[in-house]
Amino acid sequence: MSGDTGTPNQGGTRYGSISSPPSPGPQQAPPGGTYLSEKIPIPDTESGAFSLRKLWAFTGPGFLMSIAFLDPGNIESDLQAGAVAGFKLLWVLLWATVLGLLCQRLAARLGVVTGKDLGEVCHLYYPKVPRTLLWLTIELAIVGSDMQEVIGTAIAFSLLSAGRIPLWGGVLITIVDTFFFLFLDNYGLRKLEAFFGFLITIMALTFGYEYVVARPAQGALLQGLFLPSCPGCGQPELLQAVGIVGAIIMPHNIYLHSSLVKSREVDRSRRADIREANMYFLIEATIALSVSFFINLFVMAVFGQAFYKQTNQAAFNICANSSLHDYATIFPRDNLTVAVDIYQGGVILGCLFGPAALYIWAVGLLAAGQSSTMTGTYAGQFVMEGFLKLRWSRFARVLLTRSCAIPPTVLLAVFRDLQDLSGLNDLLNVLQSLLLPFAVLPILTFTSMPALMQEFANGLVSKIITSSIMVLVCAVNLYFVISYVPSLPHPAYFSLVALLAAAYLGLTTYLVWTCLITQGATRLAHSSHQRFLYGLPGEDQEEGRTSG
């Protein structure tokens, strides 16, 4: 490795190079192409100087990644947290976003340094059984996220049509509208990224409008944001806190971001180019997640102001005395605390601030659902290609994901009601939190490997912070499961939970084990773990691809 940061490595070796031989059989581009079929060139500027031109060239992946922080699951989590705890959990939102940024920084760094995404690196380093289980957990997270997008979009259509489109009809519409967005690929990568930026702008304007008209108490808001406490909180507030973490730090998003950064032309044989790319991607991700944080803050603050400690009777009276009096019947006439969801949330905003607030809310919700649909499709495609080396078109990938997400959502929409859809949304947020270790542990493992990342491996401070995130998430998840299990409706469910818990703990234990090896606990390693210490030698790469 050359000591001159402006020159390539000796022999032109690429940093983190783990390129493996092509898979057996004929190789061809995936049908319909992929996001990565086009590379964005980076302009040459003065070495070492910050350049807005370069920042603009690197801008795109971070904003696409940030959409997962703004999907309907996040919106549901925000308003539920506001309604249940007022402003008390704003600090959880703030720190979850900061921790999310740290995880996304590691994902981007892995993609830049190695030239491979997290799924591809998992395929190379993990044995067959753990990587197959890992792939299944991430696919489960993607399907869960897609169900939230379907629910959010269906509710948006129902609100915009004043109830003329039933929920099950809105669910079916999502089958059609998804394919419309697949055609956007034909217009080029930068135009696609600009379109996502447009959808984020719509969300910022619509939810920002709701914040302005609701006028939350700024003193209480700032106290909830910067004082990490929750006086008088119990299990409902804990569930919302877990939901916030699961909605903000989504497992599949870490895999997605590590692949999106590969769309920029970075010379990985030059140390300075890699360092520069890492810097610009971090700046872009920070800007993008700052925008997403304020959008989530707008929603949580609005409902913390409008819904906290409100009763169903109070909500009924507000709507009955407004121009949207026909909606009043969705609130029972009792003195129980109102259980708000994204449908009732739009209605009560309309009752409080006029019909415009309802329709603006629905437009923002629609933008959240549609933008998340496309990024979820990309994540699914990248994960499948990385773990299984299967190249599908996005059309086929959307069919697979929606085939899993649509049927249960339609059944709930037809035979149950909004309460059940809202409850499903809450459980899906908790599911994301439970699956989070299967993204954070691998990214922490591989970005801590000097053999893979060389000088860009995690330092001591980064290891401590990221490991603390992992311990915190696992502790909160464990507390939630222990609290939730006694409430199971039938003893037969205990056997199923025990079986799932055994598989969950087994995979988590293996991932923690390999992670500790890369953190310096070399005594835990045996012969099958040598790759985590010394990387994949060139002559063993094919073995690394095929051996179990």
Swiss-Prot record:
Membrane spanning segments where?
A: 56-73, 83-102, 140-160, 165-184, 194-214, 238-256, 285-304, 347-366, 398-415, 427-447, 464-485, 494-513
Reaction(s) catalysed by this chain's protein:
Zn(2+)(in) + H(+)(out) = Zn(2+)(out) + H(+)(in); Fe(2+)(in) + H(+)(out) = Fe(2+)(out) + H(+)(in); Mn(2+)(in) + H(+)(out) = Mn(2+)(out) + H(+)(in)
Biological process (GO) annotations held by this record are: iron ion transport; manganese ion transport
Which InterPro entries does the UniProt entry name for this protein?
Answer: NRAMP_fam
> Main location per UniProt?
membrane
Q: Which residues form the signal peptide?
A: none
Q: How does it sit in the membrane?
A: Multi-pass membrane protein
Does the record carry Transmembrane helix as a key word?
Answer: yes
Coiled coil spans: none
| Gene Ontology molecular function terms on file | cadmium ion transmembrane transporter activity; iron ion transmembrane transporter activity; manganese ion transmembrane transporter activity; metal cation:proton antiporter activity
Q: Where is composition skewed (Polar residues) in this entry?
A: 1-12
Per the UniProt topology annotation, the Extracellular ranges are: 74-82, 161-164, 215-237, 305-346, 416-426, 486-493
Outline which residue ranges sit on the Cytoplasmic face: 1-55, 103-139, 185-193, 257-284, 367-397, 448-463, 514-548
Region annotated Disordered, chain positions: 1-38
**Locations listed in the record:** Late endosome membrane; Lysosome membrane
Q: According to the record, which residues are glycosylated?
A: N321, N335
Q: Which UniProt keywords apply?
A: Endosome, Glycoprotein, Ion transport, Iron, Iron transport, Lysosome, Membrane, Transmembrane, Transmembrane helix, Transport
Cellular compartments per GO CC: late endosome membrane; lysosomal membrane; phagocytic vesicle membrane; plasma membrane
Q: What NCBIfam families does this protein's entry cite?
A: nramp (TIGR01197), Nramp_1 (NF037982)
Q: What does this protein do?
A: Macrophage-specific antiporter that fluxes metal ions in either direction against a proton gradient. Localized to late endosomal lysosomal membranes, delivers bivalent cations from the cytosol into these acidic compartments where they may directly affect antimicrobial activity. Involved in iron metabolism and host natural resistance to infection with intracellular parasites.
Family indicated by similarity: Belongs to the NRAMP family.
Q: What is this protein called?
A: Natural resistance-associated macrophage protein 1
Organism annotation = Ovis aries (Sheep)
